[in-house]
Swiss-Prot record:
GO terms for biological process: sodium ion transport. Gene3D superfamilies: 3.10.20.30, Nucleotide-binding domain of ferredoxin-NADP reductase (FNR) module, Translation factors. Pfam families: FAD_binding_6, Fer2, NAD_binding_1. The keyword Ion transport applies. It is found in: Cell inner membrane. This is Na(+)-translocating NADH-quinone reductase subunit F. [2Fe-2S] cluster binds at C67, C73, C76, C108. It comes from Neisseria gonorrhoeae (strain ATCC 700825 / FA 1090). It catalyses: a ubiquinone + n Na(+)(in) + NADH + H(+) = a ubiquinol + n Na(+)(out) + NAD(+). Its cofactor is [2Fe-2S] cluster; FAD. CDD domains: NADH_quinone_reductase. It is a single-pass membrane protein. The gene is nqrF.
Length: 405
């Protein structure tokens, strides 16, 4: 009798647990189709599940997300009028309490479980997707490649200087030992044993890159991509997924991009423009400066200050030298923080924020009246911003392409 009672009790417990799991599943796991109403106009029907960012992309609505949906950039904002659940702690570092009360959410953090009513920026509807072909993918510096893509014939990406596109990467495995690196850059690759790394990605990923090309360069998209290797203090960390994929691309390969996106645009004023860049932050600097001079024929005073470690890290030198020779309102300067003996460098040395201050802004009549456009490593951006604040420059005249977080 006790055995039978035990079996019955065990069966009851198992059934109770099964019912609890089914109940929880009904609450936590979405099933069936849901409808998302967009801007009081479009109604999208799709299977429940996943995040709102991906759900919209599956319907051809590409909300910008510089971090590829990781929740760190804060750019994939939408207004959720109904559905979507409560705002998550991961969103509150990007969204103020007032914005939260108005329904502002990060679409990469919103679960698609029930019918929703949302608003997205109107410019999102102008975003498209293209399958491009790799023209070239050459080293411009030790850790920077210039990826040049051909847009499909008859198409164009209607971007503004300072804008960016998003690149999709399929699941892949990339071995750094297979990279084609010119011998002049091998010294650092050998020093840090970068050939050892392998990047393995099991699902599609999405990342944003600022364009180095400017709108008059028709039919192509140019990017400057820095390889994201593990930091020296954490050598066993995985290398950057998207940068590893991009560095593996060869002429003729197909690449899917979407865009254009952006907010790092030049102001339409007569103020002096001061561009400050470093590393792969060269990309939007080139796009802006070429656009101002070659397309807009701007008469504004324009200076460009670029920081690099050594001459090996300098690129587009001939391009900017030609601009300086052609346009008297443009000058450019490079500062090397760690020049090599063989560089025979007699130009500026030190960190770029100090060089800009000592050689341009220290005795400037009104630095607060200039517009400052910058893009570079986080430490550079922070140093430049502090220097500008100390000079009395207002936030509205400090424009930053913050690709480094």
């Amino acid at each position: 009798m006790e055995i039978i009672l035990g079996i019955v009790m065990f069966t009851v417990i198992v059934l109770a647990l099964a019912l609890m799991i089914l109940f929880a599943k009904s609450k936590l796991v979405s099933e069936g189709d849901i409808t998302i109403k967009v801007n009081d106009e479009k109604e999208l029907t799709m299977p429940a599940g996943g995040k709102l960012l991906g759900a919209l992309a599956s319907q051809g609505i590409f909300v910008p997300s510089a971090c590829g949906g990781g929740g760190s950039c804060g750019q994939c904002r939408v207004v959720v009028k109904s559905g979507g659940g409560d705002i998550l702690p991961t969103e509150l570092s990007h969204i103020s309490k007032r914005e939260a009360r108005e329904g502002c959410r990060l679409s990469c953090q919103v679960n698609v479980k029930t019918d929703m009513d949302i608003e997205v920026p109107e410019e999102v509807f102008g975003v498209k997707k293209w399958e491009c072909t790799v023209i070239s993918n050459d080293n411009k510096a030790t850790f920077i490649k210039e990826l040049k893509l051909a847009i499909p014939e008859g198409e164009e990406v209607p971007f503004r200087a300072g804008g960016y596109i998003q690149i999709e990467a399929p699941p892949h495995t990339v071995a750094y030992k297979d990279f084609d690196i010119p011998k002049e850059y091998h010294e650092d690759w050998d020093k840090y044993n970068l050939w050892q790394y392998v990047s393995k990605v099991n699902e599609p990923i999405l990342r944003a890159y600022s364009m180095a090309s400017y709108p008059e360069e028709k039919g192509i998209i140019m990017l400057n991509v820095r390889i994201a290797t593990p930091p020296p203090r954490v050598p066993n960390a995985p290398p950057g997924q998207m940068s590893s994929y991009i560095w593996s691309l060869k002429p003729g390969d197909k690449v899917t991009i979407s865009g254009p996106f952006g907010e790092f645009f030049a102001k339409d004023t007569d103020a002096e423009m001061v561009f400050i860049g470093g590393g792969a932050g060269m990309a939007p600097m080139r796009s802006h400066i070429f656009d101002q001079l070659k397309r807009l024929h701007s008469k504004r005073k324009i200076t460009f200050w670029y920081g690099a470690r050594s001459k090996r890290e300098m690129f587009y030198v001939e391009d900017f030298d030609q601009l300086a020779a052609e346009f008297p309102n443009f000058t450019w300067h490079v500062a090397l923080s760690d020049p090599l003996p063989e560089d025979n460098w007699d130009g500026y040395t030190g960190f770029i924020h100090n060089v800009v201050y000592e050689n341009h802004l220290k005795n400037h009549e009104a630095p607060e009246d200039c517009e400052f456009y910058m893009c570079g490593p986080p430490i550079m951006n922070q140093s430049v911003i502090k220097m500008l604040k100390d000079l009395g420059v207002e936030d509205e005249n400090i424009l930053l392409d913050d690709f480094g977080g």
